C-alpha cells in the first residue's frame, strides 16, 4: 500500500481514485492519504488500509493534522462523495492537533462522505493542548465568515481518544 500522501497540495480535480494506504511511520505536520492540503476538488474517491505512527509539528505555525482524504481541506477545497475505511492509530505530539476520518481540519466543504473505519488517538503530556477528533472532520472552521461546511455525511465507525484535553465528535 501507499506509504506517504499521494499529493502534497491539490489545486485541481481528483476523481474516482481508490487508494490502499499502509502508513507506519513518524509523520510531521499535515498528512492525508490522498493529499496533505486540498484547495481543489476531490470527488468519489475511496481510501482503505492502516495508518499508524507518531505525528508532530513545529508548534509555531504548523500543527499535526491527519485526515483520511486530506489533512487540511482549505477554504476553496471541496470533498464530495468520498469514503474512508481506514484503521487509524496515531500518537500525537503534546501540541494542538486534529484527526478526522475525511479531513483533519475542514475550512472548505465536505459533503456526501462516509467514514466507517476505526480512529484511535493518544496524546500524552499535553494537558493544556486540545486534540480535536471527529469521524468526518476533527474541527470545522469558518474563514472570514465563509466555508466550514459539512453536509449529508456519515461516520459509522469507532472513535477512541486518550488525552487530557480532547474534543471528540
Which residue ranges define each predicted feature?
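Predominantly extracellular beta-rich ligand-binding scaffolds that present long acidic/polar faces
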Residues: 1-169
Amino acid at each position: 500500500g501507499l506509504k506517504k500522501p499521494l499529493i502534497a497540495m491539490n489545486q485541481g480535480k481528483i476523481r474516482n481514485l481508490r487508494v490502499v494506504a499502509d502508513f507506519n511511520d513518524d509523520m510531521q505536520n499535515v498528512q492525508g492519504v490522498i493529499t496533505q492540503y486540498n484547495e481543489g476538488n476531490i470527488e468519489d474517491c475511496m481510501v482503505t488500509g492502516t495508518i499508524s505512527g507518531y505525528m508532530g509539528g513545529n508548534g509555531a505555525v504548523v500543527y499535526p493534522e491527519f485526515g483520511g482524504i486530506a489533512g487540511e481541506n482549505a477554504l476553496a477545497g471541496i470533498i464530495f462523495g468520498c469514503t474512508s475505511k481506514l484503521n487509524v492509530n496515531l500518537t500525537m505530539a503534546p501540541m494542538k492537533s486534529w484527526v478526522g476520518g475525511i479531513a483533519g481540519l475542514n475550512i472548505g466543504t465536505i459533503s456526501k462522505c462516509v467514514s466507517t473505519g476505526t480512529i484511535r488517538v493518544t496524546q500524552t503530556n499535553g494537558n493544556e493542548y486540545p486534540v480535536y477528533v471527529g469521524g468526518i472532520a476533527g474541527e470545522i472552521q469558518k474563514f472570514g465568515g465563509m466555508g466550514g461546511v459539512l453536509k449529508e455525511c456519515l461516520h459509522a465507525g469507532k472513535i477512541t481518544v486518550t488525552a487530557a484535553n480532547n474534543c471528540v465528535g
